[in-house]
């Protein structure tokens, strides 16, 4: 009986800690993400569970994250809901990119969140933002080519090295 109780306790604590790793994307979250990476390049990917091309892009970014461990900072923002967090975690894990920081839309008015990110964004995914050192961004909608990401990484790595 004690073994069963311990097993259940471990199962539920693991599940809840996984969900806690997904941050609520609310008004002000975009600024929080940007300020935490001041002076650092990063990639911000908006995706959702129903997206046809998102698995391909997230798997590609996972492979690149292994190759460029120290140089590639990827943040994932799911445009689903907080209720979907367990499924989002499972899906991201299956793509191999579970080490990335994860957020999920947590407002009943998703248009407001999208507007805060980009006034010209109407919710299409995948939508990938490439932020350089000065946080000037390049926005790509649809599947991003691996060569584009590698070229972007090389350009930004050169700038990081010049700065130091």
Where are the model-predicted features located?
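Loop/turn elements at helix/coil->beta-strand transitions in domains of secreted/extracellular proteins
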Residues: 37-42, 70-73, 98-100
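Thiol-/selenol-based redox modules, centered on thioredoxin-like
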Residues: 125-164
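Structural microenvironment flanking redox-active thiols in thiol-disulfide oxidoreductases
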Residues: 56-96, 110-113
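N-terminal "domain-start" segment that seeds a small globular fold
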Residues: 14-35
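Solvent-exposed loop/turn segments at secondary-structure junctions
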Residues: 48-52, 79-83, 108-110, 135-136
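Short, internal strand/loop/helix patches
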Residues: 92-125
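Short active-site neighborhood of thiol/selenol oxidoreductases, capturing the structured segment around
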Residues: 36-52
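Sec-dependent N-terminal signal peptides
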Residues: 3-12
């Amino acid at each position: 009986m004690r073994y069963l109780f311990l097993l259940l306790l471990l199962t539920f604590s693991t599940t809840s800690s996984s969900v806690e790793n997904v941050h609520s994307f609310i008004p002000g979250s975009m600024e929080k993400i940007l300020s935490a990476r001041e002076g650092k390049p990063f990639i911000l990917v908006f995706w959702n569970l129903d997206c046809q091309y998102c698995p391909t892009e997230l798997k590609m970014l996972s492979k690149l994250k292994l190759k460029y461990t120290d140089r590639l900072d990827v943040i994932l923002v799911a445009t689903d809901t907080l209720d979907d967090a367990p499924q989002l975690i499972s899906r991201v894990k299956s793509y191999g990119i579970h080490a990335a920081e994860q957020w999920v839309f947590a407002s009943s008015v998703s248009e407001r969140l999208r507007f805060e990110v980009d006034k010209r964004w109407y919710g299409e995914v995948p939508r990938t933002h490439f932020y350089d050192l000065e946080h000037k961004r390049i926005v790509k909608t649809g599947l991003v080519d691996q060569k584009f990401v590698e070229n972007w990484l090389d350009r930004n790595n050169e700038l990081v090295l010049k700065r130091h």
